[in-house]
């Protein structure tokens, strides 16, 4: 099975009900205009710079954790700083891979459905999201991002996929393609194929 990033929408959904809603939402999907694409790219660049600072600047990471986490002391005692650094290092790498994919494939950001890609990075970027997490939830997210996602190589595309984007012309083409991916995608099977256990 290919590594196409759009399968991430199934991962994010993580249930058949949400998966069906994603498929239904394609009916309202529209093309992104140039300004919208630029805004998404700028947001990814902002996240990339943030993630880099978090694992290279100890003071910046400490400040963010103090401000973003509900119980800073408990988080540090239970989880520790090193795990956060590892995740932020990986997220810096993932956002760079995503930026490369966009640069190499002009149609990589094609429709408004693609804005969902930003949601992949929000659990370690958004203060409101991080503040609401319990220590257990944060530890679970660190395990997911630090251990289970890296083997999936989320933004590596096959030659077939590169060819698809190169020849992508219409929203109908895009919707049919993504709908087919979502309908066929089995999260548990995919994770097993990649050697990722207990996803």
Curated annotation (Swiss-Prot):
Pfam families registered for this protein in UniProt: CagS
Gene of this entry: cagS
Protein's name according to its UniProt entry: CAG pathogenicity island protein 13
Source taxonomy: Bacteria, Pseudomonadati, Campylobacterota, Epsilonproteobacteria, Campylobacterales
């Amino acid at each position: 099975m290919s590594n196409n990033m759009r399968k991430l929408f199934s991962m994010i959904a993580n249930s058949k009900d949400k998966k069906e809603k994603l498929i239904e939402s394609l009916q309202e999907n529209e093309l992104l205009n140039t300004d919208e694409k630029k805004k998404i790219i700028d947001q990814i660049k902002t996240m990339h710079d943030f993630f880099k600072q978090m694992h290279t600047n100890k003071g910046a990471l400490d400040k963010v954790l103090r401000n973003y986490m509900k119980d800073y002391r408990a988080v540090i005692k239970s989880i520790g700083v090193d795990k956060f650094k590892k995740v932020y290092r990986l997220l810096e790498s993932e956002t760079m891979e995503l930026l490369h994919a966009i640069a190499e494939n002009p149609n990589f950001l094609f429709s408004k459905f693609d804005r969902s890609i930003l949601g992949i990075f929000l659990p370690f970027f958004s203060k409101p999201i991080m503040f609401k997490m319990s220590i257990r939830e944060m530890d679970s997210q660190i395990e997911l991002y630090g251990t289970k996602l890296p083997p999936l190589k989320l933004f590596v595309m096959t030659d077939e996929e590169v060819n698809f984007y190169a020849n992508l012309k219409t929203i109908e083409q895009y919707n049919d393609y993504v709908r087919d991916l979502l309908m066929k995608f089995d999260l548990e099977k995919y994770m097993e194929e990649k050697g990722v256990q207990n996803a």
